[in-house]
């Protein structure tokens, strides 16, 4: 079957932004103008096409990136059809994982900014992620009709906060309730959209006289940026003072794809102005799959190889999202990087080294779906029927092994105990949590060996709230959650040479007799528990030695200070005595347990607390505040670096986990939400005396 659209007319783009910049509304308008949706969905009415999970419609925020396919022939209907795949990405900080994941499979992005709020904190995070994956991007300043809208203020903020190089290719005509349209700086014409046709119709006109000088100034700025694409153009520009429309577009395209500039436009998606021109810019300036370097990967011997975006190449694809669909069950969204895939094919999951059979292939139009028979290089679609594939896995031709680069997922930073409200739901809850963990790699589930409770861990409080909420909605499991907890440990600091334990019961009949002498010493951190049998001359008979070790091991689970597990100790059994009749395993087990407890009390016991490696990315103005706050949380600041590409500082510190609860909220308020942080477990370290005292007091029987 021949390819419907040549690959150079493909655009795989993301629309990403801060939480209220109007991103979902912008996506909705894109779908309306490209003819997918005939009735516009509004986020605030809870009916937007891409927000298809119930919670998203209720909360008015986008949680999962739906991949939508549409076709565009240009605002003036003068282009051949272009195939656009749009990944709608969430803007909330607890869902950054979704944004990372979609950035990985995009070729370009549209950054949507609010004309009033400008460059907000989450926009900075998303910008850094786009830098990380070197994604070319456009900027669309939305909500130009709102009170306080200011296009040029956003331009300045992009330069100052993002260290970006924005190049306006339009300027607004008016603002707030006087926002009528835009000046197209390439054609030097005004564009006014017709309200009655919901913006489907528009006309070019002359630039209003009062805007002419301003438009000239910004056109010059744009032509200069275009001229910098090559020496040849620069010479022509210096000689003639201008460039042709085709030259400007081609040069801006080259520089956008090289991540040197960000073409900037404006409009109001809600009032149907500007989105059509943004779609034209996606085609004019963002790359097709063949405009960017071929995808790198590793072969079986871990040597680097590449896969070209061509139908004739061997098949390779990356799974970037798992979702559960109410009708077909589990969907796996994949981006095909090379070759072709037909339904019914058998492919290799090269990460898990398992074969997978492709059931149906469906292309999503938000939550409607169209079945397709094959997908080719550049396509994004969802596959039904995969058994072992999870997010980040590579699928490839089973005769041409490749692992495309893995996505790196952050470790969860917050954990809570969760239990079903009724015993009957226990099994259902386990199933639900495992299904949710398969969809979301930043969410983990485990069973706590000490308490037997189910512990869920994730990227933040909102993240876990939504997980609990989804259990209730999608799986009908109501659960109660506990307070976030810290896992402390205990150990000793001194060696005790001779610790005696004697268990004797002799009151008529069969007695009990066990007697051991132990040496207890601290081990270096992370060594764990070690038991040494140094008995000479049979003072403790062979058959009782395992019972002695068992007695010590059982006592390890609950330390003498506050009942936390004991780690990093070495116990040597070197002497003891026994009774021919009364000695048995139980007596020796009890004697060992008593000796060990006694020894721990005498060997300077301490409590160890988990230390976290914390990284805060913050604008420079707040670096002092952030460092001060980390120090007040008993943190050790270990260094400060520049953020790659400018735009702030990365502060690295080691902070006790117990001091990090509520940190997201306090960091948000201390930096007006402009800083982000990540943390992961580093090691256990001795808690200071005042902290130990507080823990011991809180654990003491009341």
From Swiss-Prot:
Cellular compartment(s): Cytoplasm
Residue span(s) of domain tr-type G: 8-290
PANTHER family referenced in this protein's UniProt entry, alphabetically: RIBOSOME-RELEASING FACTOR 2, MITOCHONDRIAL (PTHR43261:SF1), TRANSLATION ELONGATION FACTOR G-RELATED (PTHR43261)
Keywords carried by this UniProt record: Cytoplasm, Elongation factor, GTP-binding, Nucleotide-binding, Protein biosynthesis
Chain's role: Catalyzes the GTP-dependent ribosomal translocation step during translation elongation. During this step, the ribosome changes from the pre-translocational (PRE) to the post-translocational (POST) state as the newly formed A-site-bound peptidyl-tRNA and P-site-bound deacylated tRNA move to the P and E sites, respectively. Catalyzes the coordinated movement of the two tRNA molecules, the mRNA and conformational changes in the ribosome.
Source species: Herminiimonas arsenicoxydans
InterPro entries: EFG_II, EFG_III, EFG_III/V, EFG_IV, EFG_V, EFG_V-like, EFTu-like_2, G_TR_CS
Main localization category: cytoplasm
Domain of life of the organism encoding this protein: Bacteria
Pfam family, one: EFG_III
Protein known as: Elongation factor G
GO biological process: ribosome disassembly
Residues at which GTP binds: 17-24, 88-92, 142-145
GO annotation, cellular component aspect: cytoplasm
GO molecular function per UniProt: GTP binding; GTPase activity; guanosine tetraphosphate binding; translation elongation factor activity
The UniProt record lists the keyword Flavoprotein: no
SUPFAM superfamilies: EF-G C-terminal domain-like, P-loop containing nucleoside triphosphate hydrolases, Ribosomal protein S5 domain 2-like, Translation proteins
PROSITE patterns with a match to the protein in the record: G_TR_1, G_TR_2
Protein family according to the UniProt entry: Belongs to the TRAFAC class translation factor GTPase superfamily. Classic translation factor GTPase family. EF-G/EF-2 subfamily.
């Amino acid at each position: 079957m021949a390819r419907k659209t040549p690959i150079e007319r493909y655009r795989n783009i993301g629309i990403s932004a801060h939480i209220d910049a109007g991103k979902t509304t912008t996506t909705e308008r894109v779908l309306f103008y490209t003819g997918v949706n005939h009735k516009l969905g509004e986020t605030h009415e809870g009916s937007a096409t891409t927000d298809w999970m119930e919670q998203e419609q209720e909360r008015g925020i986008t949680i999962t990136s739906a991949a939508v396919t549409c076709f565009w022939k240009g605002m003036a209907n003068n282009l051949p059809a272009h195939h656009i795949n749009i990944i709608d990405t969430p803007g909330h900080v607890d869902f950054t994982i979704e944004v990372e994941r979609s950035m990985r499979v995009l070729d370009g992005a549209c950054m949507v900014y609010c004309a009033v709020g400008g460059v907000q904190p989450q926009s900075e995070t998303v910008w850094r992620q786009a830098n990380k994956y070197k994604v070319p991007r456009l900027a669309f300043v939305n909500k130009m009709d709102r009170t306080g809208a200011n296009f040029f203020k956003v331009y300045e903020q992009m330069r100052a906060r993002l260290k970006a190089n924005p190049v306006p290719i339009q300027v607004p005509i008016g603002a707030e309730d006087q926002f009528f349209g835009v000046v197209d700086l390439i054609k030097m014409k005004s564009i006014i959209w017709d309200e009655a046709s919901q913006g489907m119709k528009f006309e070019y006109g002359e630039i209003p006289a009062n805007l002419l000088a301003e438009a000239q100034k910004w056109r010059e700025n744009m032509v200069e940026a275009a001229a910098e694409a090559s020496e040849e153009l620069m010479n022509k520009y210096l000689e003639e003072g201008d460039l042709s429309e085709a030259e400007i577009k081609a040069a801006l395209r080259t520089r956008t794809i090289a991540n040197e500039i960000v073409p900037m436009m404006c409009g109001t998606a809600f009032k149907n102005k500007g989105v059509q021109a943004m779609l034209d810019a996606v085609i004019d300036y963002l790359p097709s799959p063949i405009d960017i370097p071929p995808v790198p990967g590793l072969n079986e011997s871990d040597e680097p190889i590449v896969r070209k975006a061509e139908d004739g190449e061997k098949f390779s694809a990356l799974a970037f999202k798992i979702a559960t669909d109410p009708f077909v069950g589990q969907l796996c969204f994949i981006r095909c990087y090379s070759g072709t895939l037909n339904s019914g094919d058998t492919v290799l999951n090269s990460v898990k080294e398992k074969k997978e059979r492709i059931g149906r292939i469906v292309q999503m139009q938000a939550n409607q779906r169209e079945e397709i028979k094959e997908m080719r290089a550049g396509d994004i679609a969802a596959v039904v029927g995969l058994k072992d594939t999870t997010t980040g896995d590579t699928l490839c031709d089973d005769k041409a092994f490749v692992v495309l680069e893995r996505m790196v997922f952050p470790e969860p930073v917050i954990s809570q105990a969760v239990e079903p409200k009724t015993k009957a739901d226990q099994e259902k809850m386990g199933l639900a949590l495992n299904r949710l963990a398969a969809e979301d790699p930043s969410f983990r589930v485990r069973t706590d060996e000490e308490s037997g409770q189910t512990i869920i861990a994730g990227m933040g409080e909102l993240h876990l709230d939504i997980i609990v909420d989804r259990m209730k909605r999608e799986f009908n499991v109501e659960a109660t959650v506990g307070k976030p907890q810290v896992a402390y440990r205990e150990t000793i600091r001194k060696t005790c040479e001779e610790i005696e334990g004697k268990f004797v019961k002799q009151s008529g009949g069969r007695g009990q007799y066990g007697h051991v002498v132990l040496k207890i010493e601290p081990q270096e951190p992370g060594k764990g528990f070690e038991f040494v049998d140094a008995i000479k001359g049979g003072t403790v008979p062979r058959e009782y030695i395992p019972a002695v070790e068992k007695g010590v091991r059982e006592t390890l689970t609950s330390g003498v200070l506050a009942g936390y597990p004991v780690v990093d100790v070495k116990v040597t059994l070197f002497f003891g005595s026994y009774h021919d009749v009364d000695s048995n395993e139980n007596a020796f087990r009890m004697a060992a347990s008593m000796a060990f407890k006694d020894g721990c009390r005498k060997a300077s016991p301490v409590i160890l607390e988990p230390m976290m490696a914390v990284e805060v990315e913050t604008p420079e103005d707040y670096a002092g505040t952030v460092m001060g706050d980390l120090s007040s949380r008993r943190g050790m600041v270990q260094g400060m670096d520049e953020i790659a590409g400018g735009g702030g500082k990365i502060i690295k510190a080691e902070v006790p986990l117990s001091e990090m609860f509520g940190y997201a909220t306090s960091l948000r308020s201390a930096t007006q939400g402009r800083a982000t942080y990540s943390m992961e477990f580093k090691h256990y370290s001795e808690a200071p005396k005042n902290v130990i005292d507080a823990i011991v007091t809180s654990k003491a029987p009341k």
